[in-house]
Amino acid sequence: MGIRNIGIMAHIDAGKTTTTERIIYYTGKSHKMGDVDSGNTITDWMPQEQERGITISSAAITCHWKEHQINIIDTPGHVDFTAEVERSLRVLDGGIVIFSAVDGIQAQTETVWKQAEKYEIPRLAYVNKMDRVGANFFKVVEDIENKFKTIPLVLQIPIGNESNFEGVVDIILNKELHFAMENGIPKLTYSQIREEFIEKTALFKKKLIDILSQFSEEITQLFLEDKEISLDVIKSEIRRGTISRFIIPVLMGTSLKNIGIEPLIDSIVDYLPSPFEKSFTAFSLDTNKKILVDPNENKKLSALVFKVQYSSVIAAHLYFVRVYSGEINSNKKIFNASNGKREKFTKIFRVFSNKNEQIDFVKTGDIGAVLGLKFSVTGDTLIEENNNILLESVMFPEPVVLMSVEPERSSDEVRLKEIFEIISKEDPTFSYSESKETGQLIISGMGELHLEIILTRIKDEFNLNVYTGKPQVSYRESAGKIVKEVFEFNNIFAGKNINFKIGMIIKPLSRGEGNKIDFECSIDSTIKSAILRGITTTFVSGAFGYPIIDINVIIFSIVCEISKISESVFESISGFAFHSIFQKSDPIRLEPIMLLEIRTPIEHTGEIISTLNVIGGVIHSVSNIGEYDLIKSEAAFEKLFGYASILRSSTKGRGSFTMEFSYFKEKVS
């Protein structure tokens, strides 16, 4: 049985969860169709998801179609939960990007497209909501080509449009496809193409062959020899072009009305890759070099933990894993290659949304969940001994909003910290700390909605009431200039007289480069690790009390009597030294700048632009979509608290917006 690991990605409200629910129903995994508005979807199982009608966490579903196992991950469309998308894409082999036939490419569509490009994921495009007023399939196709600089391969043309949309013409099969439900059972029927569509179908078939001939020698040869190009050859070359990411097959439908689902599932099986069709990238722990590993040849276990989820039912964390080679079973001795710890699986599950079926093993290319891990987190590599490889981890964006939190009863503070630990283990974009000045607990996240969801969880899932402060901007800081200095420590530390000198250069880097630590002097590897830990730990809080980013620390000299100093002392004093020298680098404060996409009725565009100008926003573009304008701009995050209320008031409730983090910029005032 073949495997397809796919993700479903889209901007919020493009119909992602509805499409997923239809796929689950049509493949026979569910006997009822979940509905977002009714709050009874299978993939949106969290209470907050059902109440709000949005996807918050990535739900994993396994279903079957035409002798293939399809593992689907339905990912969030809201930018506050972009980490869920990021970690899901890391383990996928293929994806479906859903576009609204009315709204086309939206802000989060661009974000997930870029994320999919980063992980080189082959994709299908599915244009949904073809029955809506303003639906324009060919405009969306044109936008995909122009915006994403890719080649969309149209596989269908619409029969009717807007409220008259009733089916599609399959260009490859040269048939009309009609979709119906009879006694709750889907019924797909085929018919000859009516006369009015014959010429248009022939035109798009020619375009399809022309595109395929750009990379297919076989099709080019058959075309030149005026020979028939068989259905099998066409589908084989579409598959090859999709997997190589040369083309993006485009389909359409109206998921809510069950139109277009079967061809979409067929295309998942026909055109998206199997885990065995692509080698995966890893780092050799023997040579410390990047290598390509063929899953057909490497039979030893290598798996990536891509999600951690707390289950209140069993009061334990469930670890979602993608197996890249070998097999997971409960008898296998495993090793966490990311931290050097030994681990063990106690139970293994096949996951169906929030329900689990216990199984004996997870094989190569498959996705499952395990219990029993004690030292693993998202992004860690699990291997069996002698398979010395490290898989590429998952990178997450920085939190941009923070908030003070305290329990109603002071006696619950320890429990609140335990809850924060649970949540931070499953959500890498959530963190908490304790203010040195006030002793307050501070939580950080990707946006107001992100923190709101977490606070709701604390109340509903953990039965703990808390008080919160107002949301605040999570600033960063960096070095303002290059500084070079030797820090000398001559004092009694841990009962010993310590004389220690460390020479350090701190250089500012460009935004987004991250922090780097280099050594220009020879030093024992154990001591080097201790110094790295000491400096890295200090990055958490700089001169202004904010996390330090985008600096290069160069250690150019160390003078000490190593035998007298323990690792922990090296770690502590290195942190002191860095903190002292960083203070002299003229530290600068950095604020997050957000990208905004505002959708407003045309008559309110002028007022919206004026409001953006008042808060110091920069307008990038204004484009028209029917009765609405789409304004793309950027503004400092601190100016955007409460912007949703301002927009509602300005547009009489008809406007909407999304925003996402763009970059950090020096805060002048």
From Swiss-Prot:
GO terms under biological process: ribosome disassembly
Q: Where is the tr-type G domain?
A: 1-276
- Could you tell me what this protein is called? Elongation factor G 2
Q: What main location does UniProt list?
A: cytoplasm
Where can this protein be found?
Cytoplasm
- Name its species: Borreliella afzelii (strain PKo)
Annotated family: Belongs to the TRAFAC class translation factor GTPase superfamily. Classic translation factor GTPase family. EF-G/EF-2 subfamily.
Highest taxon in the source lineage: Bacteria
Q: Listed GO molecular functions?
A: GTP binding; GTPase activity; translation elongation factor activity
The cross-references to Gene3D superfamilies, in alphabetical order and at most eight, read: 3.30.230.10, 3.30.70.240, Elongation Factor G (Translational Gtpase), domain 3, P-loop containing nucleotide triphosphate hydrolases, Translation factors
Q: What does this protein do?
A: Catalyzes the GTP-dependent ribosomal translocation step during translation elongation. During this step, the ribosome changes from the pre-translocational (PRE) to the post-translocational (POST) state as the newly formed A-site-bound peptidyl-tRNA and P-site-bound deacylated tRNA move to the P and E sites, respectively. Catalyzes the coordinated movement of the two tRNA molecules, the mRNA and conformational changes in the ribosome.
Q: Has the keyword tRNA processing been applied to this entry?
A: no
Keyword check for tRNA-binding: no
Q: Which UniProt keywords apply?
A: Cytoplasm, Elongation factor, GTP-binding, Nucleotide-binding, Protein biosynthesis
Concerning Pfam families, the annotation shows: EF-G_D2 (PF22042), EFG_C (PF00679), EFG_III (PF14492), EFG_IV (PF03764), GTP_EFTU (PF00009)
Please give an example of a GO cellular component term from this record.
Answer: cytoplasm
Which residues are involved in binding GTP? 10-17, 74-78, 128-131
